[in-house]
UniProtKB/Swiss-Prot annotation:
Catalytic activity line of the entry: a quinone + NADH + H(+) = a quinol + NAD(+); a quinone + NADPH + H(+) = a quinol + NADP(+)
Record-linked PANTHER family: GLUTATHIONE-REGULATED POTASSIUM-EFFLUX SYSTEM ANCILLARY PROTEIN KEFG
Entry membrane topology: Peripheral membrane protein
UniProt keyword annotations, A-Z: Cell inner membrane, Cell membrane, Membrane, NAD, Oxidoreductase
One Pfam short name: Flavodoxin_2
Protein name per Swiss-Prot or TrEMBL: Glutathione-regulated potassium-efflux system ancillary protein KefG
InterPro entries: Flavodoxin_fold (IPR003680), Flavoprotein-like_sf (IPR029039), K_H_efflux_KefG (IPR023947), KefG/KefF (IPR046980)
A cellular-component GO term for this protein: plasma membrane
Record note on quaternary structure: Interacts with KefB.
Family that this chain belongs to: Belongs to the NAD(P)H dehydrogenase (quinone) family. KefG subfamily.
Regions crossing the membrane: none
GO terms assigned for molecular function: electron transfer activity; FMN binding; NADH:ubiquinone reductase (non-electrogenic) activity; NADPH dehydrogenase (quinone) activity
Length: 184
């Protein structure tokens, strides 16, 4: 008997989703998978008033949490930052009694506006992407979650339709079975 694939909560955070061809292409396979709940934060919370109990319930129901977003000023879009600060609260995700996410998996899926070569100590952005993402890795650790290597689509707006389709296929394959031996 085959085991069921892990339940994935895909938190999508892009304030200008209609303008992001890359993110729309990446998101498409997720909407076709029964084990994935795609949750567009900007569509649900345009006023930034986050339903914290609802979001925490969604987190409890899933084993893998994916944060799909563009890189904004070396961080994340404002609503996702608000979501992280409010939903991953002390007593729920960290601190005394805060073990609701312990043992779950965190993966960042990020699009950038610059090439990979711009993310080096001697390049334009002065730091590699691993340094830029360190606060998110620390947040995963604070929640006692397993940090999975991020998926990064560099220079997303310059990717050809074929390249984006290839990234989307690989992403969809991973989402379909994220905890398989080759998926982590």
């Amino acid at each position: 008997m085959m085991s069921q694939p892990a339940k994935v909560l895909l938190l999508y955070a892009h304030p200008e989703s209609q303008d992001s061809v890359a993110n729309r292409v990446l998101l498409k396979p997720a909407t076709q998978l029964s084990n994935v709940t795609a949750h567009d934060l900007y569509a649900h919370y345009p006023d930034f008033f986050i339903d914290i109990p609802r979001e925490q319930a969604l987190l409890r129901e899933h084993e893998v949490i994916v944060f799909q977003r563009p890189l904004y000023t070396y961080s994340c879009p404002a609503l996702l930052k608000e979501w992280l600060d409010r939903v991953l609260s002390r007593g729920f995700a960290s601190g005394p009694g805060g073990n609701q996410l312990a043992g779950k998996y965190w993966r960042s899926v990020i699009t950038t506006g610059e090439p990979e070569s711009a993310y080096r100590y001697d390049a334009l952005n002065r730091y590699p992407m691993s340094d830029v993402l360190r606060p998110f890795e620390l947040a995963a650790g604070m929640c006692r979650m397993h940090w999975l290597s991020p998926i990064i689509i560099y220079w997303a707006r310059r990717q050809s339709a074929q390249e984006l389709a290839s990234h989307a296929r690989a992403y969809g394959d991973w989402l379909a079975n994220p905890l398989s031996p080759g998926g982590r």
